[in-house]
Design a protein with these regions (language model features):
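Conserved catalytic cores of phosphodiester-cleaving nucleases, focusing on short active-site segments
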Residues: 13-15, 31-37
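Short N-terminal edge-element motif at the start of the domain
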Residues: 1-8
Length: 168
């Protein structure tokens, strides 16, 4: 969802995993996902670590309690039953605001880099720094997904958007 103050800079996918225990809900994970696509022949492609808005840099910023994360949290209030979940999300927002290190909060974070690659450009090395040195995310869970397609990414995107719009 785009951020009105920063067009094209909202969190790509954002959500929560709750668990019900004895009729009460507990916040298990805050899921923070960024999505990139690349047909670069470089492994990993630049969008993993090198570009200004790379998966790594974007997700690291979010995991440190950036304004983008806080805005995503605030927007989430509209989507939940106030009696069940709002207090949990509010507690999380307060924890982020008052805690520079975020060590306890990071334990509840699931960081999800999602990379779209073509069959001709994909390599196991595409996991890059998320695999070789994820230490800056210490405490957080990292679930890295790479989706490989057999067509050009532009064709895949055209087909995807047509499908979403109900054109195919």
């Amino acid at each position: 969802e785009d951020d009105a103050d920063l067009p094209k800079r909202g969190v790509d996918n954002f959500g929560f995993i709750f668990k019900e225990v004895d009729g009460e809900f507990e916040l298990q994970k805050v899921v923070i996902c960024e999505v990139k696509a690349s047909e670069s022949k470089k492994n990993p492609p630049e969008v993993v670590y090198e570009t200004r808005d790379s998966l790594y840099k974007s997700l690291l910023e979010l995991s440190k309690g950036s304004d983008r994360l806080m805005k995503a949290l605030v927007k989430s209030f509209d989507r939940f039953d106030v009696n069940k979940f709002a207090a949990l999300i509010a507690e999380l927002a307060v924890d982020i605001e008052k805690n520079d290190a975020l060590q306890d909060t990071k334990k509840k974070m699931m960081i999800v880099p999602f990379l779209l690659r073509t069959a001709t450009t994909y390599s196991d090395d595409d996991f890059g720094v998320f695999y070789t040195d994820p230490s800056e995310f210490s405490g957080a869970t990292i679930n890295y997904y790479i989706m490989v397609v057999d067509v050009a990414l532009s064709d895949f995107a055209d087909d995807l958007y047509s499908s979403v719009r109900g054109e195919s």
